[in-house]
Amino acid sequence: MPRVRRPAAPTGAATLLALMWLASPALPVGGFSYSEGLEPAVEAGLVSDEATAQAWLLDQLLLGLGRGELAVVAQAVAAWRRGDATRVRELNDWLLSTRESAELRLQTEQMGRSLGAWLQQRPGTDAAALARLLALPPAPSYPVAFALAAAGTPASLREVALAYAFGWAENMVQAAIKAVPLGQSAGQRMLGALVEAIPATVDAALVLRDGERMAFTPMLAVLSARHETQYSRLFRS
């Protein structure tokens, strides 16, 4: 697999804008339609106000993204940059294996495909690497697709992981505002709490080895499975 080329010298503003673009909720990948278990947590009475929503999201950041997903993003960026197709596939397989319900699996596959379709329209996208992404069986996961999109920038692995985590946080706060429901000011306070926790979470994820990554969130798995047959719902997960 050819390496994904990136500029030799970073251009700060361009790199920052590229990461902001990738983390933007306006990116056409459908992230707004998923709550990742938050909606069934509201239905079960586990989340009912700002305090419980904030605690839920912080736990999800620390116990979910921080222990596995963010590490995959960083490791996949490195793999794309050195042209290691075997490593990319291993990371994609591992990520998909951590999705313990049908709707969580559907979410990462749908968003991965959608990001791949967006990359097809972007000038300068490495065509060979994109073909490898879209050919990943059974589908590219969103973290691995995000990693390819970021691999062609001069951004460091830490900067890429920070952008990914912030994009996730912003989307989840918006989901909480709709599902609980909460006001915009409450949402900004929750986002502030997540932003404070993200740097240390990313730093911990960056040093994880393969055998240290994990995805042990049984409550989330149970709630997500229940959500698949929930009577009334706003979100797809």
UniProtKB/Swiss-Prot annotation:
Keywords: Chaperone, Cytoplasm, Nickel insertion. Its main location: cytoplasm. The keyword Secreted does not apply. The keyword Iron does not apply. Disulfide bonds: none annotated. Pfam families: UreF. It comes from the Bacteria. It is found in: Cytoplasm. InterPro entries: UreF, UreF_sf. GO terms for molecular function: nickel cation binding. GO terms for cellular component: cytoplasm. PANTHER family: UREASE ACCESSORY PROTEIN F. UreD, UreF and UreG form a complex that acts as a GTP-hydrolysis-dependent molecular chaperone, activating the urease apoprotein by helping to assemble the nickel containing metallocenter of UreC. The UreE protein probably delivers the nickel. Required for maturation of urease via the functional incorporation of the urease nickel metallocenter. Belongs to the UreF family. This is Urease accessory protein UreF. It comes from Methylibium petroleiphilum (strain ATCC BAA-1232 / LMG 22953 / PM1). The gene is ureF.
